[in-house]
Amino acid sequence: MSMNTVPERLAALRAAMKANGVDVYLIPVGDPHSSEYLPDHYTSLTYFSGFHGENSNFVVTPTESAVWADGRYFVQAEKEIAGTEIQLMRMGEPGVPTVEEYCGKVLPENGVLGLCGLTASCGLVRGVQKELDAKKGTIKTLNLEDELWTEGRPARPATPAWILPKEYAGFSPAEKLERLRGKLKELGCTAQLVGKLDNLAWLLNLRAMDIQCTPYAMSYCYVTPERAVLFINTARLGAEAAAELKANGVEIQEYDDVLKFLAAETEPQTVLADPASVNFAVYETLQNNAALTVKDEADPLLPMKGVKNEVELAHDREAHLRDAVAMVRFQKELEERLAAGEELTELTVDEILHKYRSAQDKFIVESFGTIAAYGGNAAMMHYHATEEDHAKLERKGFLLVDSGATYLDGTTDITRTYPLGELTEDEKLFYTWTLQCHIDIAKAVWLNYCAGHMLDTIAREPLWRHLINYRCGTGHSVSFVGNVHEGPHALNGRNTTVFQPGMIITDEPGVYEAGQVGIRIENELECYHKADNQYGTFLAFRPLTFVPIATSPVVPGVLTRDELDWLNAYHREVFEKLAPRLNEEERDWLAKKCAAIGA
């Protein structure tokens, strides 16, 4: 059977379902480590549905199929599944079922739902089973993705692994392991199977390039009071990395032996397992071992790495300044080439940015694929230009550029929206209101009990006044030399993590009008202790990102005096920090971009 198109792949999947006695098949966006960004080998949802989004699930029955997308991907998903039978489920919209509810609805009485236990989290499987119980439905673990996707499938990654030096990380693997063991003891546990790659990277200072733009290594680590066992493809570990791990008390075993090891473990342990991040196959193996008692708890590594230590913060600040130099040189060249009448495209933007970023000291890789989106393309929050589908830059409207890099000493994420020429009055207002949102959260001061969902409203209020909203969070945490998205804190309507000094967050409100315009302004911010007094402890943000923000689109009279003062003070600081790193011509250009407005 041909497997070149989505309809052909769905037909093959349905035939395999029938042969295996499966009524409904669920494919999550996932790998064995609950990663947000996936190694190409695990992009099964895209292979079978055609949709390239994150945070998604795909469900197939004998007669219908549906894919879930969150607000960042509504426009993109519509475009990518157009012309197929697949229904789009817009997550969070009124009347739209969750994937768990949908599975319960479409499963026949006494039916069987199939899924791969390695790529589905325990939490997802539990949620689905709860919905199936009313119909006496059961879950069958099998791997139809591996059975069917054989031709042209990328191999499972095994890039060279290395250890981030303590001079950048701040603490050694041995020191972090002791801290984890202490936390496990507080939680009444003696062991943990660490499966999330970002948590494991932080714990062991382990890095590789198994995921595009994300310096992580496919691996697990089993931690007890006496042992730390790393499961990794040993061929990828050089002698230096292996010796460093062993010197820090880490044993090394083969990646594929993890389930066999857990099943054979005879030392009694109370094992912490986070259902949200441990895959179902691992969780089931732990549960089936009589020597192990499984305790469901949130992964304690998440808050540990979410608060950056002073060494990490110092390096991150420096990485952001080098990144800012690249951004300044990029914008200057872009403007000069446009002014000279050169025909440029969204792809050109990516090329210019890469040229300047990759020239910076300690550059490793872009922290995600650059989003260079002109005009209406920017309404798709995670749009990516391709050779087959990209826009030319015209001398009007906005160009949105969301980009970042990972360096040996930090990870960056920045968005700027550039005016390329004539703007409509609506475009100017949308830009000005977005800038108000950005400034209001950047200059916020709050008592130290405030969580992300509370601060999120500060950012949205300027848009809410005009009955406008954006269907995504205002900000996310950023790893240190790692994933551009991490937890536990975030700025959105759901996050309950209380902010602490040392946390890093993005500030990226926006306006998105489908097919017309997309505007976003993003800096990274560092949470710090501002003051103590009789009323309590106050916290605030200060910028990590120092790159000029376009002021020509700002509508006079809209920004308050406080907002103008913040913007002008920010631009003074941008110039002071970057000028010594630039040549005379670049400094003159930057001075104009940082000129005060509204005085």
Regions found by a protein language model. Name each.
Residues 1-599:
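Active-site neighborhoods and metal-handling regions in enzymes and metal-associated proteins
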